[in-house]
Amino acid sequence: MIPYRQLVRMSHLAARFVGGADVHVVDPLVDLRNVFEQTDQLKIALECRNLTVDVEKVKNEYDEWFETYQKWKQADKESISQLKKELRAKKDGLLNALALPNLVHHAGKKQTPLLKPSKHAQYLAQQGLMRIDKQNHVVHLVGYPVVVQKMIREQLVDLFPGCQPISPSYFARAAILEALNIDQSTCIPFTDDSSHFPLTYLVGNSLPAITSPFLKTSFGEKNEWPISVQCTGASYTEKKNQVDLGNARQRMKHCALWMSKSAEELEGIINDANVRVGAYLDEGLDLEVKVREVRGSELKNYESQAFVVENRGLSLSRISRIGDYVSKRLNIQYSGSPATEKSEKSDGFVQMVYVETDIDRILARLVDDLIEGKEPPKYIRDAIKKSF
């Protein structure tokens, strides 16, 4: 069981109410009462993830903080300073509530398949096509693997023609990671060695990068829904024990994000992404893949549901239903039609679906097939020949 206190602390996300934290860049929704109104679902979400949390204690501490918060918002000049001190004294009530994971929409029951070991690293190294930098835990490719890598990257972009290409920052502040409830120990901290430099992480193409441009955004009626964006390039994580195309700290990825006004619309987006990615890997690249709905214990904190497209136990792509969990924390809203006699004003927080495909892992499995005597698709062979 994972102790609750090991969950991410939200001091940067809640900097406005904590004091002495990082530069304030996020203004999350702090009215979390609706989360505690769904106690049964919250307990299921925690049990699924193997998290031990005293929900009643967290709720009581949060209620005390929120009561003070409401007084602070309505306070006059004479009492506002004292109430601000009380808010900071009761900060754990807010921080522990913000650390709670997303509720579970649905979870799969299939066990994680047995991972078939990969032989691509030894093969490519012997061919002089890959060099492993063990000190920095990265790999360097030359020759035809680079050609195939670039081809897959371009084809994944073409796979989602409705997604607008963007080039997000490769860096994200701690508050962004906390808004996504991501374990910061899995990311690479970055500094310029000055004492005043804010806590920042090198993330590359990732969920923090692709959501950051929309921080504190309010979409209007003129936007075409769903709003969708995509990016490709290097993604970065902290060091792992194994260094190869599937586990290096720098890997090539394709990321796509959909934002919708309707939770019901997410189902169609998820199904379409599953079909597109699965068909591309299976039919386009001749990889034998299976789509699996992940179990609750495999869900990331920001996910309410997730599917993985796997080849012999190796996850090549992940489709994540997020809902409005992240948008409430990054303050990404939409404004709809004004209220009428028959309907209420349609404002709210956007609903999200995120798809991340690991290009380097796909390349690794293609090389594994080659080692086993399986020919790659003809168009890949033709592209390789042209590169020489």
What are these language model-derived features?
Residues 2-131:
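N-terminal alpha-helical targeting/anchoring segments
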